[in-house]
């Protein structure tokens, strides 16, 4: 019965908040949340996600929310975040920055869609300043130990976006523009070519979402030089 589950979920959320500042796990697969989150029929967005875990319903990403967004299963996240309007204000601001960097470099909308897909899969546009998976940080979950830059550079969303796109940046890794023939590749495959994830098939699930997000936020996103 739900009356017996809420206290357990609240304790789970509090514990998750403490974990966000702890050392990263020793494996690439993030630990799943302790129990599935029940969802009210038709409920979407960050507030619904927080409510399902017994968190304060603020519509903003606090420490506990960030941890659970990182570990919740994709099937659950696709339900809560079915449309760009389901993202919170901070998440949308980061998405506009990703778009703005692409616009500032006069990159195509397709390049911007691919960057949005990668960030949505990796972080749901949460700028992680404490590592959850190994030393992965920022909206693209880039790793200092893998040559993506310093923690300060990776958690600076414009710099992280430039690294993903392959624009001049502190990164020693190839970005989108360095992937030969990326324009003719499937968008999810381009994400994987840049990110080199242990789960290469997960990017494609966000393609429609990313296209809708670009249509919603792109017109108001200022170019970022």
Regions found by a protein language model. Name each.
Residues 76-120, 124, 220:
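Export/targeting segments at the very N-terminus of extracytoplasmic proteins
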Residues 43-46, 66, 92-99, 112-115, ...:
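Extracytoplasmic/secreted envelope proteins and their assembly/folding machinery
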Residues 1-30:
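Secretory targeting and sorting signals
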Residues 29-71:
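Short acidic, glycine/serine/threonine-rich helix-capping segments at coil-helix boundaries
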Residues 51-55, 70-74, 103-107, 120-124, ...:
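Sec-exported extracytoplasmic/periplasmic mature domains
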Residues 39-43, 58-62, 84-95, 107-111, ...:
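Solvent-exposed, acidic/flexible segments
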Residues 77-89, 123-187, 193-196:
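Peptidoglycan-targeting cell-wall enzymes and recognition modules
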């Amino acid at each position: 019965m739900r009356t017996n589950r809420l206290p357990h979920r609240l304790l789970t959320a509090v514990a998750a908040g403490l974990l966000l500042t702890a050392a990263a796990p020793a494996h690439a697969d993030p630990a799943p949340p302790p129990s599935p989150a029940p969802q009210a029929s038709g409920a979407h967005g960050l507030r619904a996600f927080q409510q399902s875990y017994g968190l304060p319903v603020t519509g903003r990403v606090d420490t506990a929310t960030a941890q659970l967004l990182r570990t919740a299963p994709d099937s659950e996240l696709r339900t809560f975040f079915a449309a760009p309007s389901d993202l919170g204000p901070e998440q949308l601001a980061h998405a506009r920055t990703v778009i703005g960097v692409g616009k500032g470099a006069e990159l195509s909308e397709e390049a911007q869609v691919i960057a949005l897909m990668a960030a949505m899969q990796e972080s749901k546009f949460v700028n992680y300043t404490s590592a959850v998976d190994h030393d992965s940080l920022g909206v693209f979950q880039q790793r200092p130990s893998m040559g993506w830059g310093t923690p300060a550079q990776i958690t600076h969303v414009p710099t992280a976006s430039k690294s993903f796109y392959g624009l001049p940046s502190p990164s020693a890794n190839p970005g989108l523009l360095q992937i030969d023939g990326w324009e003719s590749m499937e968008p999810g495959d381009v994400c994987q070519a840049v990110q080199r994830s242990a789960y290469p098939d997960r990017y494609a699930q966000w393609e429609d979402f990313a296209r809708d997000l670009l249509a919603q936020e792109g017109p108001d996103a200022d170019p970022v030089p």
